[in-house]
């Protein structure tokens, strides 16, 4: 869930631990001094001062290191909240596409906040914690919008006599640890209890962990979730801001970890076929059009679903009748020429005029060829379909391909476990 760039600072209660960096109004996360010590090139991203890349490694080197080893990413700009109350599941179901009632405790799911017309307000991860709350993470670029949305809906919910309270986690940073060596590195640097937790934590599962790298706070513990935005095995650690800087520094002492910036994070997520809100997802797109029908829980697909799914009339109609979907999100792959940039028009030999548009694109470091995500008319979405992308007033051949471009390596819970 890499949030689209916004040129102004987000000034919200949930980021109260962040301080001003300079006259531009950018905000610092608790890892700011770590970034500077590692020679980061900082940019303003969604109003935050964040690293685009680090000294001694170019973007491709950073990308490949995550695919082969372990990289850490500062994602503290994202919006972290807890939903408390006896009716917390009903509250979040009333805002999203997910079936939380049937989601096992200790696990999470990707989801989308929905508008009344079925459009996507934001994408998010909802964790149904063993503790009496939901832990939710969504995008920084949408933080102000979603904060206001949650506050308004909480008031409406309370007036209806139901019990749900939104807690904005302004005192927590968020560190993503990604790559095939992530598990080993974390396991070697926790307590016996922590090792037992990690040994029984699989993809999209979440738990409190008492200690990492010798750091702990029993009154304000860290939460670790086995998930990420790269397609690799990995974790996201929600850490009290007072421990964040030392956690990053101690991870670097292992000599097995490298810090990774936003540029490589974007190429990693694109290879993994993951959406970027503001590019691949928006308020004008439904989950079905975004090829995310699987986010609509089976129970929520019933007209009698309680609560009803937001925008259900349109979404359920699209699920039942493919003719209701005029365009869909797809993956396309090309050669080694210029990159397909967002907004580039897509053409076909079969009809005159554009058939779609690129929403994200890059030269894949893993594949050595251009890949992109795009929205095209439904009749042009079959894998193997030959298309052309207009780049600098020239047409370059691309082929519709299945997503993800690079197979993911998530460690899923065995079915018999």
Cite the ranges covered by each PLM segment:
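Well-ordered mid-protein domain cores that form the structural environment of catalytic cofactors
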Residues: 98-153
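Acidic, proline/glycine-enriched N-terminal capping motif
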Residues: 2, 12-114, 119-121
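Conserved, structured C-terminal
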Residues: 2-5, 14, 18-46, 50-54, ...
């Amino acid at each position: 869930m890499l949030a689209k760039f916004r040129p102004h600072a987000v000034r919200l209660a949930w980021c109260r631990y962040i301080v001003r960096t300079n006259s531009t109004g950018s905000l610092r996360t608790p890892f700011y001094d770590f970034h500077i010590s590692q020679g980061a090139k900082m940019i303003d991203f969604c109003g935050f001062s964040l690293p685009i890349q680090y000294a001694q490694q170019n973007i491709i080197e950073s990308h490949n290191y995550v695919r082969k080893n372990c990289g850490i990413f500062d994602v503290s700009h994202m919006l972290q909240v807890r939903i408390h109350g006896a009716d917390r599941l009903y509250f979040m179901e009333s805002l999203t596409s997910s079936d939380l009632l049937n989601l096992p405790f200790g696990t999470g799911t990707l989801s989308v906040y929905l508008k009344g017309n079925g459009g996507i307000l934001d994408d998010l991860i909802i964790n149904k914690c063993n503790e009496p709350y939901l832990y939710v993470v969504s995008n920084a670029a949408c933080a102000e919008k979603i904060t206001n949305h949650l506050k308004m809906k909480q008031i409406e919910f309370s007036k209806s006599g139901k019990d749900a309270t939104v807690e904005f986690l302004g005192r927590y940073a968020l560190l993503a640890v990604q790559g095939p060596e992530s598990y080993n590195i974390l396991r070697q640097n926790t307590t016996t209890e922590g090792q037992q937790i990690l040994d029984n934590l699989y993809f999209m599962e979440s738990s409190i962990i008492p200690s990492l790298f010798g750091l702990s706070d029993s009154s304000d513990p860290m939460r670790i979730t086995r998930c990420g935005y790269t397609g690799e095995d990995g974790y996201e650690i929600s850490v009290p801001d007072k421990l964040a800087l030392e956690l990053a520094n101690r991870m670097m002492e292992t000599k097995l970890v490298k810090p990774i910036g936003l540029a490589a994070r974007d190429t990693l997520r694109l290879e993994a076929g993951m959406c970027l809100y503001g590019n691949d997802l928006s308020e004008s797109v439904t989950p079905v059009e975004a090829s995310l029908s699987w986010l609509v829980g089976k129970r929520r697909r019933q007209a009698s679903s309680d609560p009803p799914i937001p925008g259900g009339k349109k979404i359920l109609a699209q699920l039942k009748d493919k003719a209701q979907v005029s365009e869909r999100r797809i993956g396309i792959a090309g050669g080694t020429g210029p990159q397909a940039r967002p907004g580039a028009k897509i053409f076909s030999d079969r009809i005159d005029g554009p058939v779609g548009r690129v929403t994200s694109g890059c030269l894949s470091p893993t594949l050595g060829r251009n890949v992109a995500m795009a929205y095209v008319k439904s009749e042009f979405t079959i894998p193997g379909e030959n298309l052309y992308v207009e780049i600098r007033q020239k047409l370059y051949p691309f082929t519709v391909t299945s997503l993800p471009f690079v197979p993911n390596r998530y460690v899923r819970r065995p079915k018999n476990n």
